[in-house]
Amino acid sequence: MKPKKNQYQQMQAFDNMQGYQPQFGANPYPQQGQGSQMQTMGMQPMMPMQQGQQGQQGQQGFGFPGQQQGGGFQIPSGPTPSGPGQSVPGMLPVEESYIENILRLNRGKTATIYMTFENSKEWGSKIFRGVIEAAGRDHIIISDPKSGTRYLLLTIYLDYITFDEEIAYTYPYSMASYSPR
């Protein structure tokens, strides 16, 4: 039975590969100006004349993934940059005119909701009529004013919605930005 190589012996096998220079640690792809950062983390960049000296250093010069050798990266804390998720009262957030947001703007209005239930022998397609109470990313809640029944409808089955009155929809066109081509 052949004895298993330890990590140091495996790394020596890599050193013998012509032109191969392993770089392990937090960032295996150092960018410009990170050479000094590698040395502060207990790593030394390999140069052709240092390859022979590597055997004397043992595992000290290598940092394996999952092992931290002092130093390290810190994730900056503080406020996150504002983006398209910012909302203005009475308006939809920039580039977020999703169906649930439009339905929220029209809460309290009567709507007719057309849905198709594929692979259903009972229903196929069905029409729901009621007052919009709430809407989420994947659902719509309406109530039938005549019967008092509330329906929780999944938007995956939604085809389209009609309203008997004007739809409240204010899209912030002036805030939309397009990158030049």
Curated annotation (Swiss-Prot):
> By its UniProt entry, which InterPro entries does this protein fall under?
Spore_coat_GerQ
Q: Where in the cell is it found?
A: Spore coat
Q: Where is this region: Disordered?
A: 19-89
Effect caused by changing residue 2 to A/Q? Cross-linking not affected. Cross-linking not affected. Cross-linking eliminated, but still localizes CwlJ properly
Which keywords does the record carry?
Germination, Isopeptide bond, Sporulation
Result of mutating residue 5 to A/Q?
A: Cross-linking not affected. Cross-linking not affected. Cross-linking eliminated, but still localizes CwlJ properly
Post-translationally, this protein is described as follows, namely:
Three N-terminal lysines form epsilon-(gamma-glutamyl)lysine isopeptide bonds with glutamines of other spore coat proteins.
Q: Name one GO biological process term.
A: sporulation resulting in formation of a cellular spore
- The protein's predominant localisation is other
Biased segments, Low complexity type: 30-57
Q: What induces it?
A: Expression is sigma E-dependent.
* Pfam families on file: Spore_GerQ
In this chain, composition skew of type Gly residues spans 58-73
Superkingdom in the source lineage? Bacteria
Gene Ontology CC entries for this record = spore wall
Cross-link named Isoglutamyl lysine isopeptide (Lys-Gln) (interchain with Q-?), sites: 2, 4-5
Per UniProt, subunit arrangement is: Multimer. Is cross-linked by Tgl and YabG into an insoluble high-molecular-mass complex that appears very late in sporulation.
In UniProt terms, what function does this protein have? Essential for the localization of CwlJ in the spore coat and for spore germination triggered by calcium and dipicolinic acid (DPA). Its assembly into the spore coat is dependent on the coat morphogenetic proteins CotE and SpoIVA.
Q: Can you say what this protein is called?
A: Spore coat protein GerQ
Source organism per entry reads Bacillus subtilis (strain 168)
List the gene name. Answer: gerQ
